């Protein structure tokens, strides 16, 4: 990561800012880059996605903010992954439409505390050669990620 940032800094020292760009009208490159890296960010998550067994109730609000990992890694073979987690409580109004009652209660949600770029697991296809039975057993190369059309 440090080597990449150094290369970018050297590139800008050699080339300067892109022509036609007035600083202040566009977000500077380093700020764009820093905001895009793999890190924890405040995200909205649906309560029902986090607690799918609670479909008999309505919740207000229907989603909550928690810190989750997100952002780009320097290589497409890597994915921004949570390496640390904790449980956090959020006050929610639970509505029971059958009984026409509601109450405020604390529900627990998983929040990410640390993130890291790690190799993607479960790749669709490893790109290994496969035998093509229609061509008399000849080997054919299957591009990565392509399994059907």
Swiss-Prot record:
Span of the signal peptide: 1-24
GO cellular component: extracellular space; membrane
Keywords: Disulfide bond, Growth factor, Pyrrolidone carboxylic acid, Secreted, Signal, Toxin
Primary residence: secreted
Subcellular location: Secreted
Modified sites of kind Pyrrolidone carboxylic acid: 25
Tissue/organ expression: Expressed by the venom gland.
GO biological process terms on file: induction of positive chemotaxis; positive regulation of angiogenesis; positive regulation of endothelial cell proliferation; positive regulation of mast cell chemotaxis; response to hypoxia; sprouting angiogenesis; vascular endothelial growth factor receptor signaling pathway; vascular endothelial growth factor signaling pathway
Coiled-coil portions: none
InterPro entries: Cystine-knot_cytokine (IPR029034), PD_growth_factor_CS (IPR023581), PDGF/VEGF_dom (IPR000072), PDGF/VEGF_growth_factor (IPR050507)
Region (Disordered): 118-149
Disulfide bonds: 38-80, 69-115, 73-117
Alphabetized GO MF terms: chemoattractant activity; growth factor activity; toxin activity; vascular endothelial growth factor receptor binding
Family recorded in the similarity comment: Belongs to the PDGF/VEGF growth factor family. Snake venom VEGF subfamily.
Functional note: Snake venom VEGFs that may contribute to venom dispersion and prey subjugation by inducing vascular permeability and hypotension. This protein induces an increase in capillary permeability after intradermal injection, as well as a drastic hypotensive effect after intravenous injection. The hypotension is mediated by nitric oxide (NO), which is produced by VEGF-activated endothelium NO synthase. Also induces angiogenesis in vitro. Like other crotalid VEGFs, this protein interacts with VEGF receptor-1 (FLT1) with a high affinity, whereas it binds to VEGF receptor-2 (KDR) with a low affinity.
Subunit structure: Homodimer; disulfide-linked. Interacts with VEGF receptor-1 (FLT1) with a high affinity, whereas it binds to VEGF receptor-2 (KDR) with a low affinity. Does not bind VEGF receptor-3 (FLT4).
Stated name of the protein: Snake venom vascular endothelial growth factor toxin 2
Biological source species: Sistrurus catenatus edwardsii
Native organism taxonomy: Eukaryota, Metazoa, Chordata, Craniata, Vertebrata
